[in-house]
Regions:
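A short alpha-helical cap/connector motif
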Residues: 1-137
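Switch II (G3) loop of P-loop NTPases
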Residues: 141
Length: 141
């Protein structure tokens, strides 16, 4: 398990590896697909961080989550997998092409039905949310 680019100590890295779940074929494919994008691939949430997000979402029993900055959907897949069975995730992605890539990856991962992707500036999407909308988990990427 890498501790780059965000340094974490070995004890935390071991804990995440042991408790947060591994990387299946879909996640490995998204990692490869994103790496092929060149220098912008650094925008992908690191696998260890994404696994930790999934664990946090699962442990909190979150029903409704938000992600600002979806990129290729890697973090969104992990967040959606951690949600309660009838939970939902709303993702905000500025770039329409990246949103389409994320949608395909979410669908392939089997969590597409839980995820809405809003294309455009996140501030506009957030302002459009109903006032009474409760959010249990938010990830600003």
């Amino acid at each position: 398990m890498s501790t780059d680019p965000t340094p974490i100590n070995a004890e935390l890295a071991d804990y995440v590896r042991d408790h947060a779940g591994g990387r299946d074929q879909v996640l490995l494919k998204v990692e490869e697909q994103t790496a092929a994008m060149g220098s912008i691939s650094i925008m992908q949430t690191a696998p260890e961080q994404a696994a930790f997000l999934e664990m946090l979402v699962r442990l909190t029993g979150a029903m409704r989550a938000l992600e600002i900055g979806t990129f290729t959907g890697y973090g969104a897949i992990r967040i959606a997998r951690g949600l309660a069975p009838d939970g939902s995730l709303t993702c905000f992605e500025l770039d329409g092409e990246r949103a389409a890539v994320a949608r395909a990856n979410l669908d392939e991962a089997g969590v597409g039905e839980k995820v809405e992707i809003v294309v455009g500036p996140a501030i506009e999407g957030l302002r459009a949310l109903p006032d009474e909308a409760a959010v249990d988990f938010a990830y600003l990427d």
